[in-house]
Amino acid sequence: MEIAFDLSTIFTDNIQRLTRTDLLKYGPKRYWAVAQSIDCLGEMSSKFHGWKRVITMYDKIVDHDEEQTTYIMWEKVNGSKSILKGLLRVGYKTLYLTDNEQNQYMEKAMCILDFFVVPTEQRSGNGFKMFDEMLKAENVTVDQCAFDKPSAALQQFLEKYYDRKDLVWQSNKYALCSNFFIGRHPTVPFTPRQTKRASRASSAVSSHASSRNTSPIGRNRPRHDSVADLMRQDMLAGVRAEVDPNSPTGLKNARDFGHRRIW
């Protein structure tokens, strides 16, 4: 993509690193080409990825609460013109993440927010040059990066140049290399849970054992005597103590039972 401005009057590198401070210094009133380069590349990136809105714009970057860094790949041509080849926007974000073992993390990661190479400049190694320059400048590795909604093209790029095949997808639409979690300690380690069926079975067994051993109903229930106990009681009832006829009890018995013993 060609722009009618000699970027060599502003930029010092063919892969120019621009912080928010740099972008504020190169304001659109005096350096309109900087804002226009970012806006044009951002619009092309959104169309290429099929996004509904443009996510990379000069105004959004300088007004954003979080610090972001933009890389522009360009080349000077004859006269006062330049060719724009690609754009890469990155920034640190605090993310809630989960690994393949369901351990949970809260990590501040370098996020790849927008990565685009102009179609006519693709298949020439420009994407790798720009991405590798970013890794060196930010002092990170590809395994330390989190990718925001990585496209199929970006996944192929990671596999081709960095041998990263299986990304770990997150509920927030970010994706990471599996090596991202090596050496990191989970905020919430995964704890296996019982299935509902196993939980119900365990509860039923516990309830049955408790009712047999500790139920108040079982403790207060009337005792049922055995047949042997009843026979023993009858035998004991047949044995009566001898009473002196002249004692009060003997006199009472004589009066009540016609002056004769009935047993």
UniProtKB/Swiss-Prot annotation:
Q: In the record, which residues are listed under signal peptide?
A: none
Top-rank taxon of the source lineage equals: Eukaryota
- GO biological process per UniProt: microtubule cytoskeleton organization; neuron development; regulation of microtubule cytoskeleton organization; thigmotaxis
The enzyme's main class, written as a single word, is transferase
User: Where does the N-acetyltransferase domain start and stop, copy by copy?
Assistant: 1-181
Compositional bias, Low complexity, is annotated for 200-212
Q: Which Pfam families match?
A: Acetyltransf_16 (PF05301)
Locate the compositionally biased regions of type Basic and acidic residues: 253-263
Its recorded reaction(s) are: L-lysyl-[alpha-tubulin] + acetyl-CoA = N(6)-acetyl-L-lysyl-[alpha-tubulin] + CoA + H(+)
Enzyme Commission no: 2.3.1.108
Instruction: Provide this UniProt record's keywords sorted from A to Z.
Output: Acyltransferase, Transferase
Residue segments, region Disordered: 191-223, 242-263
* GO molecular function terms attached to this record: L-lysine N-acetyltransferase activity, acting on acetyl phosphate as donor; tubulin N-acetyltransferase activity
Q: In which tissues is it expressed?
A: Expressed in touch receptor neurons and in a subset of ciliated neurons, including PDE, ADE, CEP, and OLQ neurons.
Upon gene disruption, the observed phenotype is: Mutants move more slowly off food than wild-type animals, but retain the ability to slow when encountering a bacterial lawn. Mutants exhibit significantly reduced nose touch sensation and are partially insensitive to body touch.
Database matches in InterPro entries: Atat (IPR038746), GNAT_ATAT (IPR007965)
Annotated binding of acetyl-CoA, by residue: 115-128
What this chain does, per the entry, is described as:
Specifically acetylates 'Lys-40' in alpha-tubulin/mec-12 on the lumenal side of microtubules. Promotes microtubule destabilization and accelerates microtubule dynamics; this activity may be independent of acetylation activity. Acetylates alpha-tubulin with a slow enzymatic rate, due to a catalytic site that is not optimized for acetyl transfer. Enters the microtubule through each end and diffuses quickly throughout the lumen of microtubules.
UniProt name for this protein: Alpha-tubulin N-acetyltransferase 2
Species, as recorded? Caenorhabditis elegans
